[in-house]
Swiss-Prot record:
ATP binds at L19, G20, E21, G22, G23, S24, A25, Q26, V27, K42. The active site is at D137. The keyword Transmembrane does not apply. It comes from Deinococcus radiodurans (strain ATCC 13939 / DSM 20539 / JCM 16871 / CCUG 27074 / LMG 4051 / NBRC 15346 / NCIMB 9279 / VKM B-1422 / R1). It is an enzyme of class 2 (transferase). The keyword Transferase applies. Plays an important role in radiation resistance and DNA double-strand break (DSB) repair. Involved in transcriptional regulation of genes important for bacterial stress response. Phosphorylates PprA in vitro. This is DNA damage-responsive serine/threonine-protein kinase RqkA. The gene is rqkA. Residues 13-272 form the Protein kinase domain. Signal peptide: none annotated. Contains an N-terminal catalytic kinase domain and a C-terminal PQQ binding domain.
Amino acid sequence: MPLTPGTLLAGRYELLALLGEGGSAQVYRAQDGLLGREVALKVMHDYLPESDRSRFLREVRTLARLTHPGVVPVLDLGQEPEAGRPFFTMPLLTGGPITRLGPLEDAPGPLARFLTAAAFASRALHHVHSHGIVHRDLTPGNVLLDDTGLPRIMDFGLVALSEQTRHLTRSGVTLGTPAYMAPEQAKGGGVDARSDLYALGAVLYRVACGSPPFVGDSDQSVLYQHVYEPVPDPRDLNPAVPDAVARVLLWLLAKRADRRPQSGAALAHLWALARRDLWTTHARGQYRGGRARTGEHPDGPARVSDMQELWSVALPGEVTWPAAVVGEGDLVAVGTRGGQLVLTHTSGRPFATYAARDEVTAPATLIGGHVLYGAWDGTLRRVELQSGSEVWRHQARAEFTGAPTVWGGRLLAPSRDGHLHALSLRTGELAWAYRAGGSLAASPLVWAGAALQCDETGWLHALDARSGTPLWKVEVGTVHATPALLPGPPGTATLVIATWEGEVHAIGLEVQNGRAALAGEDAIRWTYDVEDEVWASPALTALDLPPDSGAAPDASAAPGGVVVVAGWGGKVRGLRLADGEDLWERTLDGRVTASPVISAGLVFLATEGGELLALDVRNGEVRWTCRERSGVQATPLAASGTLYVAFMDGTLRAYRNAHPEWRSEQEG
């Protein structure tokens, strides 16, 4: 007899709603009347044979042995009185399947959440395997998120204990889910912990890319591909997947078990290395912190109470707008009006100077041991850092003014004559070019497979980043400053554009048919007029505002982010991302063309009058200030606990919070 909402089990659990149903059981949302909380209740179907009852009870016993926070525990065990069906209760998970963390977007926040979840699930599997248990059926539906975004493994109905594996096969039937099944399991062979790691790799592949590694018209087609076909590179399906993440996924999906990571603990370590690679390359090497251009860097100075100059070096030329300091590993780079790109060690020691035939004011891009930089003579170069050799050179008809943007094995570069060029990253050959309606000064952004480019005649263009095909465009006003984009809930984002005339627009985006689209007929969520020219890009952070932030009285009621925008006249404002309401404002002593940079809850600013500041991003309070004789137009870099600033007179300085021993040496 089927159960219905309102049914009371064991005099304690009132069934509220059916959450899901499988071949052996139903899962309900239920109210625990004794403890006054909602739980998930799993009850076996009443028509199943005794063998399935044994499997159901084995799942309960298995869960009872596991105590890792990444495994859903058993809260209670009972029996439905009429048919004698066993049931057990578990915590109710409200975050949905792990696929809600994807597909991956090119911004630090979503990537960090993915890596945190991947490492947590890997450690949970290690705990499971250390008890001699193999799950055998990991799928996105069996890895659910809690309300903090951490994954919990559940549904151990096909669990294989090392001494009982032979009892869990049926003649002619392969148990498991084909889309996530290891090759040895697909062939009906023996399984072990590495089979689960393969399945977790397939699950995380789907999270990262939006689809599993293999799809087909039938289960047999999918199983065949798992056994015999090479795994498609995840970067081909979703170019936002970082190289470090792609490498781990492909390693997990090796056909031979002995070529995969050998334990969940080893896998968790690989995710930690991928996170380190993300922090050292994603945010520093590309202008404004990556392809989303949020202006937020993950590892800048967290303490600024005693920030002092660490070193300074003279550059062979002035440094002016729209230049920016970028970095990778132990190198920082900035271009000059003298026609050179200068690379310096983070210690202040010179590394290399690369020449151009004209000014190098567009921000460079450092990636994978190479540097990409454009000049005013219309040349764009790729140089190998170790040898200094030029890999290729592309000649355009006008100067390059925006930062080269690496995406999907290509390079997107805007030129002054209104063309957005897509070049092969490997060869420099032109893949496509798009002609906007006017000159381009802003750098492109990439989100959800779309290149977003503003021009100086007032239009925001959205293109298919692979083909250059126009998707849509919207009129926003003349734009010199590169916009910034902050992903929201999966499949959504907010794009913030500051126009030259002083209007700041927040535009809602969403994924439609795999590409970025305007969110609704009126996608402009709010507009704020700074009543000044704007040359600096806005900076965005997802930092939520606590009640004691000292910002606007109702700031705590509007979580979701902060926008920092600077007018050319020197007035800087903090706005709520949700609605554009004022949080704080501060007037600086000098014009602002350098874009603000956010890191560790601080916003770093520099003026043409030589004033450097660190403000609390929540309330605008000054945490550090310094004045130099020369002004700044280039966007600084906050990385590895250090602030790097290139001054208009051609001086590059590094600032860092002083260590006590260093300070005493300075004073002595």
